[in-house]
From Swiss-Prot:
EC annotation from Swiss-Prot or TrEMBL: 6.3.5.7
UniProt-recorded Gene Ontology molecular function terms: ATP binding; glutaminyl-tRNA synthase (glutamine-hydrolyzing) activity
Native organism: Deinococcus geothermalis (strain DSM 11300 / CIP 105573 / AG-3a)
Lineage top rank: taxon: Bacteria
Active site per database record: 75 (charge relay system), 150 (charge relay system), 174 (acyl-ester intermediate)
UniProt keywords, alphabetically: ATP-binding, Ligase, Nucleotide-binding, Protein biosynthesis
Reactions catalysed according to its record: L-glutamyl-tRNA(Gln) + L-glutamine + ATP + H2O = L-glutaminyl-tRNA(Gln) + L-glutamate + ADP + phosphate + H(+)
TM regions (residue ranges): none
Gene coding for it: gatA
Protein name: Glutamyl-tRNA(Gln) amidotransferase subunit A
Quaternary structure annotation from Swiss-Prot or TrEMBL: Heterotrimer of A, B and C subunits.
A cellular-component GO term for this protein: glutamyl-tRNA(Gln) amidotransferase complex
Family that this chain belongs to: Belongs to the amidase family. GatA subfamily.
HAMAP family xref list: GatA (MF_00120)
Length: 483
């Protein structure tokens, strides 16, 4: 069995008694130790051996488990019982979760073994995984560059083969952009398709948990486990999963729309990868046409005037009284002030202040209310576009991974990194970043991604199309160097 085996292959091997959950766990730990310089993981799961042993007991009792023994990491904003959930922030440095997130519960119920928690931008606010209190995560393709964010640790864990699959969260592109920067798949499901129970909130109307993988079969495997209604999440949809990896036949007769507004400002390598993907689709029997979604030009402005007010509200609880590392002071007000001043990083403070301002008296109508109207307009424009095509295509990012420190002092430049992804969250649509090739920058090959977008609840179609693209050789999948 290859060190680069997929989750599908590993689960099959464990079920067939060709290996054991404990052996897979130990191998994953060795890979994680060898790649420590990437800083992909914040912590290891002390209960992983216990989980592996439980999986073995269930197998010995005759159970069939879809993720039997598969090692996986989850982003550090997902609660795992008995482990720290820090969200990449000092204010939660010692918070130990008393329960499992629904997504984690479903993974372990299917036989997966959680080996650790992945690094992330603080409270998922970032596009580079540089704002974590535990230091930046490095891109394995070029350690001088970022892996994207905010789910950079999860993406690197899969790209560098620490684990075959991982979980992240996507509020404005935080699964798809890191997937593009590291050369793997990253799926942002339809809003409500995967339960958010146990996910620490950034912007509740935008957050969605999504998987990283190196094959369409693994995406299908994970989504069949993760998706489905959860009564503990009021926004959870009752849409039973029916995912499959797909074949080239799924591309025959497909109507593809290329979003015109996403064709400007791309680097030559991104443009070449997009054109190669479109040519491959045409060759497989799809029709390709340009379509316009005019309101997407306002998506970044609307996104930050919706996400930051929600963040301001969600993060108000971290004051040291109930949640957060409390800083001692002579009185309660001083303690709360110091707790937030010392516990939050610069970017989190910036977004809290921006959100508070947008919600303040006299500015609500000018900013938040207007942004919500733009959000509805974006959803309507996407719905109109889908009246003529089955799937929309854009670059995932207009450029490959940028250098560490390049955008940290320019927040607007950092925010613009999500120009191709935020509109999808505003509209609640499913979208998948597909590894589409490489661009050589300063002598280094850097991955680039192409984004497939589908109407609501057509997540299955995206995974099937990924399998079809694999079948015609249009997916460029390579394991990144871990050391």
């Amino acid at each position: 069995m290859s060190e680069c085996s997929t989750a599908t292959d590993l689960a099959r091997a464990v079920q067939a008694r060709e290996t054991t959950p404990q052996a897979l766990l130990e191998a994953a730990r060795r890979r994680a130790e060898a790649a420590r310089d990437l800083n992909a993981l914040i912590s290891l799961n002390d209960r992983a051996d216990e989980q592996a042993a439980r999986v073995q007991v269930r197998l010995d009792a005759g159970e069939t488990l879809p993720l039997a023994g598969v090692p996986i990491v989850v982003k550090d904003n997902l609660n795992v019982i008995g482990t720290r959930t820090t969200c990449g922030s000092r204010i939660l440095a010692n918070y130990v979760s008393p329960y499992d997130a629904t997504a984690v519960e479903r993974l372990t119920g299917a036989g997966a073994v959680i080996i650790g928690k992945a690094n992330m931008d603080e409270f998922a606010m970032g596009s580079s995984t540089e704002s974590s209190a535990w230091g930046p995560t490095l891109n394995p393709w070029d350690r001088e560059r970022v892996p994207g964010g905010s789910s950079g640790g999860s993406a690197v864990a899969v790209a560098a083969n620490l684990t075959p699959v991982a979980l992240g969260s996507d509020t404005g592109g935080s699964v798809r952009q890191p997937a593009a920067f590291t050369g793997i798949y990253g799926l942002k499901p339809t809003y409500g398709r995967v339960s958010r129970y146990g996910l620490v909130a950034y912007a509740s109307s935008l957050d969605q948990i999504g998987p990283f993988a190196r094959s369409a079969a693994d995406l299908a495997l994970l989504m069949n486990v993760l998706a489905g209604h959860d009564p503990r999440d009021a926004t959870s949809l009752d849409a039973p999963p029916a995912f499959r990896p797909g074949t080239p036949d799924d591309l025959q007769g497909l109507r593809v729309g290329v979003i015109r507004e996403a064709l400007e400002g791309n680097t030559p390598g991104v443009e070449a990868a997009l054109n190669a993907t479109l040519d491959a689709l045409r060759g497989a029997g799809a029709t390709v046409r340009e379509v316009s979604v005019p309101s997407v030009q306002h998506a970044i402005a609307a996104y930050y005037l919706i996400a930051t007010p929600e963040a301001s509200s969600n993060l108000a609880r971290y004051d040291g009284m109930v949640y957060g590392e409390r800083v001692s002071a002579p009185d309660a007000v001083s303690s709360m002030t110091l707790t937030r001043e010392q516990g939050f990083g610069r970017e989190v403070k910036r977004r809290i202040m921006l959100g508070t301002y947008a919600l303040s008296s006299g500015y609500y109508d000018a900013y938040y209310s207007k942004a919500m109207k733009v959000r509805r307009l974006i959803a309507q424009d996407f719905a109109r576009a889908f009246g003529n095509v089955d799937v929309l295509v854009t670059p995932t990012s207009p450029f490959p991974a940028f250098r560490r420190g390049e955008k940290t002092q320019d927040p607007l430049a950092m925010y613009a990194a999500d120009v191709d992804t935020v509109a999808i969250n505003l509209a609640g649509l499913p979208a998948l970043s597909v590894p589409a090739g490489f661009e050589r920058v300063d002598g280094v090959r850097l991955p680039v991604g192409v984004q497939l977008i589908a109407p609501p609840l057509q997540d299955e179609r995206l995974v099937a199309l990924a399998g079809g693209l694999e079948g015609i050789g249009a997916v460029r999948m390579e394991v990144a160097p871990a050391s």
